[in-house]
Amino acid sequence: MGFEASYDVIVVGGGHAGTEAALASARAGARTLLLTHNIETIGQMSCNPAIGGIGKGHLVKEIDALGGLMARAADRGGIHFRTLNSRKGPAVRATRAQADRVRYKAAVRSVVENTPHLFLFQQAVDDLIVEGERVAGVITQTGLRFRSPAVVLTVGTFLGGRIHVGEVQHAGGRAGDPPSIALAARLRELAPRVGRLKTGTPPRIDGRSIDYAQLTEQPGDAPRPVFSFIGARDEHPPQVSCWIARTTEHTHAIIRGALHRSPMYSGAIEGVGPRYCPSIEDKVVRFADKDSHQVFIEPEGLDTHEVYPNGISTSLPFDVQFELVRSIPGFEQAHITRPGYAIEYDYFDPRDLKPSLETRCLAGLFFAGQINGTTGYEEAAAQGLVAGLNAARSVRDLAPWCPRRDEAYIGVLIDDLITRGTAEPYRMFTSRAEYRLMLREDNADLRLTPLGRDMGLVDDARWAAFCTKREAVERETQRLAATRLDPERVDREAAERVIGGAFSREQNLLDLLRRPEVDYAALMGLEGAGPGVEDPRVAEQVEIGAKYAGYIQRQQDEVARQQRHENLALPEGLDYAAITGLSMEVRQKLAAHRPHTLGQAARIPGVTPAAVSLLLVHVKRQGGNGPQSPRPDDGRARA
């Protein structure tokens, strides 16, 4: 008999989903094996060198609050930080960092290699070991057998991956890496619903060949935001600027003249591409009225001259890529170091997943990342953390965990996927969350770190830092409520300048801070008001808590109303045809989706409020009143 070894959890893939899955599993106490086809590519940024953005930054903060790695790696590798939507309300503000690819990957690798209970092995996986109706391990390309009752697949674009550059195409998982053909075929045998998606990347440019005098500089923010709740600015490497270029009508004419050579328009690519990150061909066709598109010039790192021209992702032939790049002002002498390409790959309908991200087709098998139809490092990492955690919990016979929609963007992401599915690469936006005022970046730790601590994900150092911050916020809020300003005892003119109006009666500082025009730092400058807190993150929490208290309370009341029936479990084998009053359309949709809870049923397109009421009555009559799954504080998962 050949080689065989056993682990509690096996994670296949070392990208953003895989590393978070393996780390979460190991932190939760499971003896975890991370299998990757190449250890040198662990944590690699396969597409653009950036972390965060609108909606995505919220996911990164939540991963961090649960003890994950992405935010810390972004702080250690980030060379350009910005807060997006900084002039808008706190619900939609988002952190984004350009990362040095080498430094980011090194930060990930360092943590992975130094995490207890986590083991690495370099080998591609070709098959699953299946015993009855559950997974029992994996078989590698050389026949090595690794056994485990829980396997997490985080295989990115590698399943049946095919790379396209113009009329030329070849098998590949990404540039320079082979695809997973045997594993893709095996999964197609097991999973009932499979499709093809597509993504792409732009040509890379030697920055020395660009005329920056024709571009617009985009410096980072000062002061810089910090991604991790336990991060600091002194961790950041030296900072650099990004730049903005623009395509021209000549650029668009070149593209239109070569569309017949594009695999997207010739029919060579069957996969659907990301709606919110279209190729330059798509932009020119879909937005024919626009005579110019922005191109963001993003540095790849401090020790390389390569730049990433974000905005001209393309699968056009290389000669066309060369011509269109040189038609952009400032790029007349540009030297392309790597061609752009499109890649299409298999994904599996996420409606065939449980909220834990365990598949319905095979017990113990979990999916995370692009295999579930998502796009983006952040979406992948969030799924990886949940899948890895639940894989570890499953082998200890603990209840699975998934945050609700009102608890986290991670909950919104997973609920959207398993309830609605997706026919195109799914990207997170703040607009997808109905409770976004409660789900801000700044309070992700307050929302999730206690839960992470209960489940063993949060270490002592992070927990101590969290408790210190939480106590400081509570202490300062109480101080502001107890401190009163008397108009007779302060500089009236200075006070009215700070509060933006007349100051004629005694008020406490918390009430004054609730006024939209009042700034915390300015308020603390008034005689008798300070000194305030020095930590800007504590000050931000205090100010947002004061200003939005009424709105947040209303949203919490709405959540409470929804929660009365949101988590009501629907029996696994519920016969929708037997429920009197449901239309044929609703019965078909419920049978196709098989929702886990009444809340999920209500979010299926075409399921009416009346149908939800009928479902509720039916389940109540059958004696159903339990939640979808126990919370992690049910006493069985203490750290």
UniProtKB/Swiss-Prot annotation:
Cellular compartment(s): Cytoplasm
Obligatory cofactor(s): FAD
Pfam families linked: GIDA (PF01134), GIDA_C_1st (PF21680), SAM_GIDA_C (PF13932)
Entry GO CC: cytosol
Binding site for FAD: 13-18, 125, 180, 370
InterPro entries to which the protein is assigned, alphabetical: FAD/NAD-bd_sf (IPR036188), GIDA_C_N (IPR049312), MnmG (IPR004416), MnmG-rel (IPR002218), MnmG-rel_CS (IPR020595), MnmG_C (IPR026904), MnmG_C_subdom (IPR047001), MnmG_C_subdom_sf (IPR044920)
Keywords on record: Cytoplasm, FAD, Flavoprotein, NAD, tRNA processing
Binding site residues for NAD(+): 273-287
GO MF term (any one): flavin adenine dinucleotide binding
Keyword Cytoplasm among record annotations: yes
Annotated segments matching region Disordered: 620-639
GO biological-process terms attached to the record: tRNA methylation; tRNA wobble uridine modification
Subcellular location, principal: cytoplasm
Subunit structure: Homodimer. Heterotetramer of two MnmE and two MnmG subunits.
Main function: NAD-binding protein involved in the addition of a carboxymethylaminomethyl (cmnm) group at the wobble position (U34) of certain tRNAs, forming tRNA-cmnm(5)s(2)U34.
Family: Belongs to the MnmG family.
Record protein name field: tRNA uridine 5-carboxymethylaminomethyl modification enzyme MnmG
